Amino acid sequence: MPVALCTMSHSPLMGRNDPAQTVIDDVDAAFENARTFIADFAPDLIVIFAPDHYNGVYYDLMPPFCIGAAAQSVGDYGTESGPLNVDRDAAYTVAREVLASGVDVAFSERMHVDHGFAQALQLLVGSITAVPTVPIFINSVAEPLGPVSRVRLLGEAVGRAAANLDKRVLFVGSGGLSHDPPVPQFATAPTEVKEKLIDGRNPTEAERNAREQRVIDAGRDFAAGVATIAPLNPEWDRNLLDVLTSGEIEQIDSWTNEWFVEQAGHSSHEVRTWIAAYAAMSAAGKYRVTSTFYREIPEWIAGFGISTAVAVDE
């Protein structure tokens, strides 16, 4: 059955700390193009790779990868809350085949997800329930992280599994590109923050609002040039997009985790979701990128990208 791809950056600052209207118009046009692409493809199933930002997955048990057979959106930053429309049978099929391929992946019957999943689904298909979904969490913030080669192997295994589902499958990757938002690092965090990173579930409304306001303030400071976080790196972003477009994803295997941080900020690891999605596409054979959008948007603390791709019949 046919497969297709849409990868996108997300930002909780969209609508809260916006750039110039011309930039918003460009982003809106790119998303409209992506929505049209997806509507024309008419997926039966979305397999979405996304990170978490200490809203659903914590250091009390931090897997590198996790497939959800059921998932609940926590509704942070005003995103839609409630259960995702998860295709449980498909999730089990994908998990079995990924494990059989030698990639160790965790499995959840009660996954909690945040804006990394919810914002992508809302922007691309209208809601978190519009299309049956298999959510796949990829740890992209909580060190230690495995090598990026394992992410590619995960994606390839998911792609092979999807080929056996007898469904039109859209692979979505949500995250990145270069960015360094104020996400605490466990090794250097104060004790009280470490406790929140270990198990910060069910925050009060006041706690969540305060946390979100810190990120909004950081975005405003970053856009004003007074923040201490790492700068965006458009050159790095475009190089990544070029590699993914080329189909030679194995090039990324040599990129070390330290190099990601040095070049593109701590949260550049979120591009693991793009790598997994493109690797899943590659499992079906050659692919062709049909659109690529990129803008450097400091107000959203993001090198912001959107891409779409289809399989090439050989």
Swiss-Prot record:
Pathway: Aromatic compound metabolism; 3-phenylpropanoate degradation. GO terms for molecular function: 3-carboxyethylcatechol 2,3-dioxygenase activity; ferrous iron binding. The keyword Cytoplasm does not apply. It catalyses: 3-(2,3-dihydroxyphenyl)propanoate + O2 = (2Z,4E)-2-hydroxy-6-oxonona-2,4-dienedioate + H(+); (2E)-3-(2,3-dihydroxyphenyl)prop-2-enoate + O2 = (2Z,4E,7E)-2-hydroxy-6-oxonona-2,4,7-trienedioate + H(+). Its cofactor is Fe(2+). Pfam families: LigB (PF02900). Keywords: Aromatic hydrocarbons catabolism, Dioxygenase, Iron, Oxidoreductase. It is an enzyme of class 1 (oxidoreductase). One of its GO terms (biological process) is 3-phenylpropionate catabolic process. Gene3D superfamilies: LigB-like (3.40.830.10). InterPro entries: DHPP/DHXA_dioxygenase, Xdiol_dOase_suB. Its EC number is 1.13.11.16. It comes from the Bacteria. The active site is at 115 (proton donor), 179 (proton acceptor). Catalyzes the non-heme iron(II)-dependent oxidative cleavage of 2,3-dihydroxyphenylpropionic acid and 2,3-dihydroxicinnamic acid into 2-hydroxy-6-ketononadienedioate and 2-hydroxy-6-ketononatrienedioate, respectively. Belongs to the LigB/MhpB extradiol dioxygenase family. Homotetramer. This is 2,3-dihydroxyphenylpropionate/2,3-dihydroxicinnamic acid 1,2-dioxygenase. The lineage of its organism: Bacteria, Bacillati, Actinomycetota, Actinomycetes, Mycobacteriales. The gene is mhpB.
